[in-house]
């Protein structure tokens, strides 16, 4: 078991508490942050779903009201008049065959990718490169669309894509420690509301089984699942 430094051990004091309110958990995560850089605040949600069934594979996206606190570099795989639309909306890299070829040569200097439906056959050629890195455009998350301008603006504004893993756990960032508790809570509420709306009818029992908030270097703070659900519905 790895040994943690004094700062981490000090930060973990009191984290054995469970059943915190949403407000308590977020405030504690911010208060206990100790790194010299502006840490990202992440949320882990254990859902009562079985991802091996396609109708229980929770996947989606949400535009956080306060963004993520970082510049998102967007690559748009488009052609024709859509190129000008993408550039005007603020896309960092725009192209068709040339952009696909660039990725084939090893270029991956972007954070999100958007494509029009007619370009997906060509983008599929680099699926093995984009997929494992979470960069593959997907219609379910709104990154395969003819409305390129809206997609670019949403991603730039702090649109977060999420997907449950094999264990049914969903991970997503909700901002930076420097945001302060109030803005982080607003972002978390948007995330919880979106996840709650995606509950499949085939999922039985408790949907939000466990929720925890943690900073990049800090410990996790467990939120009472019932409190999380009520917060998402308030």
Curated annotation (Swiss-Prot):
GO terms for biological process: regulation of translation; translation. InterPro entries: Ribosom_uL1_bac-type (IPR005878), Ribosomal_uL1 (IPR002143), Ribosomal_uL1-like (IPR023674), Ribosomal_uL1/biogenesis (IPR028364), Ribosomal_uL1_3-a/b-sand (IPR016095), Ribosomal_uL1_CS (IPR023673). The keyword Glycoprotein does not apply. It comes from the Bacteria. GO terms for molecular function: rRNA binding; structural constituent of ribosome; tRNA binding. Keywords: Repressor, Ribonucleoprotein, Ribosomal protein, RNA-binding, rRNA-binding, Translation regulation, tRNA-binding. PROSITE patterns: RIBOSOMAL_L1. GO terms for cellular component: cytosolic large ribosomal subunit. It holds the Pfam family Ribosomal_L1. The keyword rRNA-binding applies. Part of the 50S ribosomal subunit. Binds directly to 23S rRNA. The L1 stalk is quite mobile in the ribosome, and is involved in E site tRNA release. PANTHER family: 54S RIBOSOMAL PROTEIN L1, MITOCHONDRIAL, LARGE RIBOSOMAL SUBUNIT PROTEIN UL1M. Belongs to the universal ribosomal protein uL1 family. HAMAP family: Ribosomal_uL1_B (MF_01318_B). This is Large ribosomal subunit protein uL1. It comes from Maridesulfovibrio salexigens (strain ATCC 14822 / DSM 2638 / NCIMB 8403 / VKM B-1763).
């Amino acid at each position: 078991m790895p040994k943690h430094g004094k700062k981490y051990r000090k930060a973990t004091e009191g984290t054995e508490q469970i059943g915190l309110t949403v407000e308590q958990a977020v405030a504690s995560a911010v208060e206990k942050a100790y790194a010299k850089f502006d840490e990202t605040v992440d949320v882990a949600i254990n859902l009562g779903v079985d991802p091996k069934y396609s109708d229980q594979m929770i996947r989606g996206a949400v535009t956080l009201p306060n963004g993520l606190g970082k510049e998102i570099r967007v690559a748009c795989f488009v052609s024709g008049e859509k190129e000008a639309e993408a550039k005007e909306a603020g896309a960092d890299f725009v192209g068709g065959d040339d952009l696909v070829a660039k990725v084939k040569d090893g270029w991956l200097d972007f954070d999100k990718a958007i494509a029009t439906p007619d370009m997906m056959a060509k983008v599929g050629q680099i699926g093995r490169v984009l997929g494992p890195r979470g960069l593959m455009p997907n219609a379910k998350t709104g990154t395969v669309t003819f409305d390129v301008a809206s997609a670019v603006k949403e991603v730039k504004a702090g649109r977060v894509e999420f997907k449950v893993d094999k264990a049914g756990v969903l991970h997503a960032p909700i901002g930076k420690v420097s945001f302060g508790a109030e803005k982080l809570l607003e972002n978390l509420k948007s995330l919880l509301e979106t996840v709650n709306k995606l509950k499949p009818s085939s999922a039985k029992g408790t949907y939000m089984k466990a929720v925890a908030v943690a900073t990049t270097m800090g410990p996790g703070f467990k939120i009472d699942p019932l409190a999380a659900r009520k917060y998402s519905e308030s």
